[in-house]
């Protein structure tokens, strides 16, 4: 699943060597469904909502109001009750910032969502395309609106401390100011229609899957805190808390996390969570090692803890560690910048390097997940081509989920399945909805990006198929993307190399044709946790220069190509970084490479063998042989699927 953006313009497929696209035959039923495509991206009339928000802004004496996407834990994916930016703007993508002045409103988002946002925003909104030349950032737009000593407001729980400071400094130079408003104004506009916060029970994640007890993890964390000479660590990121305590929850769809905070000091471990989420099993699991406290007492406790520390040690008091993703509100509760050390979380670094138990779980769950995908694609082709069944995108996605549920340790999906036919595949984060989605056309490209949660790991895989006869242009585009995937998969590089440095390997073949894609090449993947996991990744984000790829990292490898209004192509495998043996060891340092764990055939009729080198063709055939070896036993009593798999994994020749 696509996690991160790349600020580069989309190019046209005509650059592949033709000035026009060959016509794609579509039955009338498909054409009708595509005509309804815009309905899937319905706009919401935000006039009344904006009017009410502006009334509240006047009452609070602010001129500009910022509405981030994130919740108070800076989560990428959020619970329905935290969908404030979507409520006020109508834009449902996972990333973006809304800004409202007394006369204007703007929505900033990245390249994954340009198409979607342009369809969902009504006439009240201006779309700020992030990374596009001559388009202001949301910070620049805000500063422009706040000229002349105006006041900008934001909920301090929804913006990072560093983000607030940066904006505050910019506004000061403009004679303006930033204020935190603890009562969220969008919540007041939303009123009684706002969904209730989730109240699901928390579950213990057994050590046989985590590979390490929570006591061992806390001990390791305390060693890191001792090295940094800090008074303690206040933790706000939900996946970090779930990982640290070997607990899982259901508060955010598809992400097995729960709303909580934690404070770890040299002598205490405190978990801040609503009491009604705690079961006797969790109490027994945590035992005497962890004190459970009310969720809403975190800010008061953090303030008291910091003040007590300063009173005891005076000016020499050591600072509290806080993630650089933590909220402005949490930083202020600890006394602000001078009493806090903001840094990349040591838990994020530790979590990103999977232990041997987690790596084994990743391998195992991807084989089971691959079997589900094989059964699904065999079924889908048979329904569309042989039975002539009319299926829409949601019908297909539901069938895939149904198949996955049959496999051991299945615990749900890891994100909304992107089941997309024809032009819908060009919408990078397309979300089909029953009643407005398209009928799947067997004579068009079908892109399916999906993933699942298993107790032993998390999967994320994209496959692009054509169940008819693809055009030469479609085959060429697909093969260029495949070459990029292979380049990352087979890369060998010295320890200390970042994902930023590797990114060009995936893009090089598209670049040679003057083409590109508007998203990152890879993101970290959690172990029965969030499908998007930092701090590592492969892409052009500056953050990726700061964290080198390390053995044990689990990352997606997912180059793509998108022709707006026509089709999308993406191929995605999950890969694991590991040390590799090389003939030489320049610099006397370890050399790294990748091991792929995704096991599903790559659409063979979209591959143009003449565009592959001999080594690339060998990689494809070796990969398909591995898929066959590891999955065919699932279909001993299913001759149809077994035959389909055998056909799709047979050697390809030039």
UniProtKB/Swiss-Prot annotation:
Organism: Aspergillus fumigatus (strain ATCC MYA-4609 / CBS 101355 / FGSC A1100 / Af293)
Taxonomic lineage of the native organism: Eukaryota, Fungi, Dikarya, Ascomycota, Pezizomycotina
Gene: ampp
Name of the top EC class for this enzyme: hydrolase
Keywords: Aminopeptidase, Hydrolase, Manganese, Metal-binding, Metalloprotease, Protease
Pfam (any one): Creatinase_N
Coiled coil feature spans: none
Keyword Ribosomal protein: no
Co-factor: note: Binds 2 manganese ions per subunit.
Protein name as annotated: Probable Xaa-Pro aminopeptidase P
Binding site for Mn(2+) 2: 449, 460, 572
Cofactor: Mn(2+)
Stored PANTHER family: XAA-PRO AMINOPEPTIDASE 1 (PTHR43763:SF6)
GO MF annotation: an example: metal ion binding
Binding locations of Mn(2+) 1: 460, 558, 572
